[in-house]
Amino acid sequence: MVSSRRGFNPIAFTPWPVTILTSLVYLALIIPIIVVHHLVPPAPKQSPPGVDLEEAWHDLQHLTRQYHPYNSHSNDEVHQWLLKRIRAISATTSARSESQGGPEVFVFDDNQTNLTFSSAGVAATAITGVYFESKNIVVYIRGTEDEPGEWWKSPDGEPSGKGGVLVNAHYDSVSTGYGATDNGVGVITTLQLLKYFTTPGHYPRKGLVLLFNNGEEDFLNGAYAYSQHPMSKFTHTFLNLEGAGAGGRAVLFRSTDTEITRFYGKSQHPFGTVLARDAFKLGFIRSETDYHVFDGVFGMRGLDVAFMEPRSRYHTDQDDARHTSIDSVWHMLSAAITTTEGLVSYTGNEFDGDSGEGGKLNNGVGTLGVWFDFFGSSLAVFQLNTLFGLSVALLVVAPLLLILTSVALFAVDKMYMFSMYTYLSESGGQVSLYGLRGMFRFPLILGISTALTVALAFLIMKVNPFIIYSSPYAVWSMMLSTCMFFAWFISCVADFARPSALHRAYAFSWMFGILWVFLVIATVYQRQHGIASSYFIVFYFAGVSVATWISYLELFGLSTTQDYARRQSRLSDRTPSSDSHLLAPSADELPSSGSVAGRDFNPEDVEDEEPTESTSLLRGQQRTTFANYASARGSQESNISNQGSSLLHPKNNRLEQKWSIYLVSSAWILQFLLVAPIVLILLGQLGLFLTSATYQIGADGGSQFIIYIGIAVLSVLILLPLFPFIHRFTYHIPTFMLFVLIGTLVYNLTAFPFSHNSRLKVAFVQEMDLGTGKNQASLVGVEPYIRDIVHAIPFVNDEEISCTSKGYGGRTKCSWPGLRPTVVDGPYKDWVTYNISQTKEDKTTRFEVSGKNTRACKLLFDSPISDFHVHGSVVDKRIPHTGSKGVSEVRLWSRNWENTWTVDVEWTKKSAERTGRVMCLWSDDNDLNLIPELDMIRKFAPWWVAITKLRDGLVEGSYSFKL
């Protein structure tokens, strides 16, 4: 007797190898992707030369002791502390410079620059005008190849030589956050860059400008003001350090071009994908960073590196040093050192080219890029043109290759796919090939599993739409398990009813066709809109194309359809009875050692072998119940595992098409490895990145349905590489996925959506009508939770609460009479003083505005004005301060407290009623009882609530006017 285990094939297309190998590959890739996404690489135990991590951490703790928005006294304290730290580092450098020839360091405390510009609005609406006075700190480290002299002291001075490098970080925080990651880590990183590039061995070849800008949180004011500083003429490239989350890894948000991105790609732990840049470009991400000014206004070339999650801590009291880590500091710092070092050491002329339009700098022209990281350890960077060329090549070559292969198969008479019958050339008799069996199985499996997965998105949105806010992985698990289980279940039912050896080939063919259409759309967007996020489709399609081609190549190993028809005809002639199917051998009867009774094995001999009294009467008969499927299939695999030839198709040739006995049993593993790994790496990263960027936008009024649909679609795309093989899975993993589905579905439908680590953000503002004494405190948040929060505040009567959702972008504003704030000593009517006067021609109105204990006021107009001018202000033709639809609001910022602004306003001809409000703002909440209503909310609001600011001021005091 021949051993039953002889010739076992561990990669045969049988249930256990398929289940185990595919599961191992998925786990081996998904687990590292999740780990890399959430765990920050550890900081070195000993600080590298040129930096001091312990010092950096102490600086971060000092910087984040208080809220320090621009309109606060603590902001002045931070400003003075930064100057002290910068000068201390510079003094060490100066002493070293005298003895070792170190670089010169120049510190500019910018207390003179101002600018009038517009900060928001589009052509179809009135815009917001801004007047801002700078409190920026600019540090220039002269490069070893920079021209000597102090050209900036001359009013018309211009830099010579190659352009320098700018590193920017804003040091103001919001009024409700300590600013540890937004943007304390960026500030501390910039301080350490000053130390690093003034340390021997690290001196920059090109000049380095470090900008500590103030006023970013109030619509990028500090970056706009930098446009008026002399150093803005010198810097051609930039690195912007920012924070839109609270901890984790620093992400490459955006980059202007391929060439600049390559410098970041050399960092030790690059992290990011071009998807973020495209999201900004398409308007899916509306918040902006200083990158917008440096790129869009100045025409500089550079990068935007920022923290991105969790957004529930962003702009709240949990954006503090306790909720970040030295590892996060090092991740940003190490990337900044590598990127900046590459830029200041670059000697080419790539960033010194022709002048841009609109007075932009001479920065040359870059190429749009594509980038994505691999497990946070390397960065793939290439041009969008390369991606476009590859896309076009695949769109043409891949279908052509399949067509030529199909023609060749027809030519050699081996095209079993798409063929129901063949005809004997001798007699013209018809022989069934069953080549269409399983042809429409894949769209059925894909359609039903996708529909059920998407249906869950609708269900969650209907019952518990905010569950993703705190439990994104519960949502992912639910979607993945739904798709996985139902795809397997439908596949098994179809395979039980109509087994087909062509399931793999047809599945890949359908995938090929669907992805080809997706690639056409992606290619159009690449060319016409510069959208590069479709890179995963290109690689997905490439893998599927080769896998599909392999399925076609497998058919060359079969006999011709004519030879098969002749054998079947001879068999039919010898056994004309209705029981002729008994002549088909069972799996046990196939030889295990390549021979039968001492002679060479030939499948034709087996087919012609007569049944005997010892032949099983049940072999080859169709299964009749699904209950018998598992045992029949398990017995079948057990028998097949004992066969001697690894090239024979593993299933009983009666259960699938008889000609399939010659199909290569191991080809499936090559197909799987061509598709699954690259899909998991690219889509896994994209899925987690999208989740991190969007899963908490619901608190800001964003559509959560898009998030659920996105996860559902990504779940299908991630599992799609399994679909050609999933009918071979054992029941164990799908059954486990069913339990996961049930558990996560119940949890997602019933669990409370917020937690201590994922608090719901609501925005606060208190509005004082100084003319009438009306005092309204307000919270803005999402329904129905905003009403529960307001009702939890003591001394607020239900009949006094008024709520409206108009004009708040999916959120609701609930207001009630609040406790009087004490942001100013004295009667509230004295908080704001103003005077309005008309010119003789009645074309211009002059406003004189001042507020006590503040340096921020604004003018609001019920009808847009055509123009305005702030006395003593500078205007820049690169940055228009008015628009075709006029100006509806003028914001006034001063570096001095209780300043008086003089503003001349020109009215449009349509301004029949000249009405509006004169308003001043107060943003300092570092002491108790300054804003007692806010103190009350913080004390009595539910534990799952976080307070953030609604607008620039926590308290707004205003007078109405009518001319």
UniProtKB/Swiss-Prot annotation:
MF terms (GO), sorted A to Z: metal ion binding; metalloexopeptidase activity
Co-factor: note: Binds 2 Zn(2+) ions per subunit.
Record site feature (Transition state stabilizer), residues: 314
Residues annotated for Zn(2+) 1 binding in this entry: 170, 182, 242
Sequence ranges on the Cytoplasmic membrane side: 1-15, 413-441, 495-504, 557-668, 727-732
InterPro entries (alphabetical): Fxna-like_M28_dom, M28_fam, Peptidase_M28, PFF1_C, PFF1_TM
UniProt topological domain (Vacuolar) ranges: 37-391, 463-473, 526-535, 690-705, 754-963
Organism phylogeny: Eukaryota, Fungi, Dikarya, Ascomycota, Pezizomycotina
Major place of residence: membrane
GO BP field: proteolysis
PANTHER family cross-referenced by the UniProt entry: METALLOPEPTIDASE M28 FAMILY MEMBER, VACUOLAR MEMBRANE PROTEASE
Protein name: Vacuolar membrane protease
EC assignment: 3.4.-.-
